[in-house]
């Protein structure tokens, strides 16, 4: 699965899944409409791995359930380093219909965004300095992902490279007063 590399990344545990399921059901029932949510995690779910390879194996073409939005797959070989264990978290999100996007990192050179089964799956830019030798000098994968949430529950995202010494930002730097 991972080109000979054994993945030992921990999967999300059952208590998290139960808590998510139990918290969203009453919230969704209160107003008789689905409460929209976003999920933020560090290690991508196994479905990110599956969706990515489905996209690649389909000649990098969209399918009915899978849409490429933007970004690059900068990691070599294994590309998506997820847990091998299917936690059922993604299936719960699809079933509840409330989680519209999930955001994760972990794979420092990836910044691609896919939509899979109605959920946006999104790598952010890397903000570290020690993951790989000289990563602080590369620049292209450094920055942030802007998430703009709208009052109707929809959202939009964009990646911005804030590597100030090398690239011009899209917007002026904000003055910070302390």
Model segments located where?
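Short catalytic/ligand-binding loop motif for oxyanion handling, primarily in non-cytosolic enzymes
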Residues: 3-4, 46-50, 110-113, 131
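A residue-identity detector for tryptophan
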Residues: 1, 53, 138-140
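Binuclear metal-dependent phosphoesterase catalytic core
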Residues: 80, 88-96, 108-178
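His/acidic metal-ligating clusters that form di-metal
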Residues: 5-105
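Active-site metal-binding loops of divalent metal-dependent hydrolases
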Residues: 1, 43, 105-107, 126-127
């Amino acid at each position: 699965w991972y080109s000979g590399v054994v993945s030992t990344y921990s999967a999300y545990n059952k208590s998290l899944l139960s808590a998510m399921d139990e918290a969203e059901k009453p919230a969704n029932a209160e107003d008789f409409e689905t409460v929209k949510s976003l999920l933020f995690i560090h290690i991508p779910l196994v479905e990110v791995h599956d969706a990515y390879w489905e996209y690649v194996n389909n000649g990098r073409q969209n399918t009915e359930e899978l849409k490429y939005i933007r970004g690059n797959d900068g990691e070599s070989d294994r590309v998506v380093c997820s847990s091998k264990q299917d936690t059922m978290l993604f299936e719960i999100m699809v079933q509840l219909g409330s989680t519209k996007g999930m955001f994760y990192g972990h794979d420092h050179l990836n910044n691609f965004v896919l939509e899979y089964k109605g959920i946006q799956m999104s790598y952010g830019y890397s903000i570290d300095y020690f993951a790989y030798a000289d990563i602080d000098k590369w620049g292209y994968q450094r920055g942030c992902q802007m998430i703009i949430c709208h009052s109707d529950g929809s959202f939009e995202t964009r990646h911005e490279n804030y590597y100030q010494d090398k690239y011009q930002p899209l917007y002026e730097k904000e003055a910070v007063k302390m």
